[in-house]
Curated annotation (Swiss-Prot):
It comes from the Eukaryota. Induction: Accumulates in response to cold. Reduced levels upon treatment with geldanamycin (GDA), a Hsp90 inhibitor. SUPFAM superfamilies: Prefoldin. InterPro entries: PFD_beta-like, PFDN4. It comes from Arabidopsis thaliana (Mouse-ear cress). Its main location: cytoplasm. GO terms for biological process: cellular response to gibberellin stimulus; cold acclimation; cortical microtubule organization; mRNA processing; protein folding; response to cold; response to salt stress. This is Prefoldin subunit 4. GO terms for cellular component: cytoplasm; nucleus; prefoldin complex.
Length: 129
């Protein structure tokens, strides 16, 4: 805080380090929003794969249509069940990694908030609206 005799004392000097911390916080905040979208998408995909697996159990047909790229191919039901299970496991692992990354970033953001609020007090707003 920079105080001079004729000034009110409310002026803050923003150092290069402070600006870097603010920029880092901003990037982390943007990443959290991206991760939220990715997590939501991964959860939906996991649920859809679970539903597909359940529907496949109820299917009477030995050959089912399975999407490969942009086309559907007739594939034996057992192969499709295996593939759906593999896809579900991969999606759930990906979801766990995304949630861990988000947790790590939120921890970093909390530490930066503490540092920035300690210096700037009410002069800075780092909260979501």
């Amino acid at each position: 805080m920079q105080q001079q005799g004729s000034k009110s004392g409310s002026e803050m000097e923003v150092t290069w380090e402070d600006q870097q911390n603010i920029n880092i916080f901003s990037r982390l905040n943007n990443r959290v929003h991206d991760l939220d979208d990715d997590i939501k998408s991964a959860k939906e995909k996991c649920e859809n794969l679970e539903d597909a697996g359940n529907e496949l159990i109820l299917a009477d047909e030995e050959m089912v249509r399975f999407q490969i790229g942009e086309v559907f191919a007739h594939v034996p039901r057992d192969d499709v069940e295996t593939k759906i299970e593999e896809m579900k496991e991969a999606t759930c692992k990906s979801l766990e990694k995304l949630e861990q990354e988000k947790e790590s970033i939120v921890t970093q953001m909390a530490a930066l908030k503490k540092v920035l609020y300690a210096k700037f007090k009410d002069s800075i707003n780092l909260e979501e609206d």
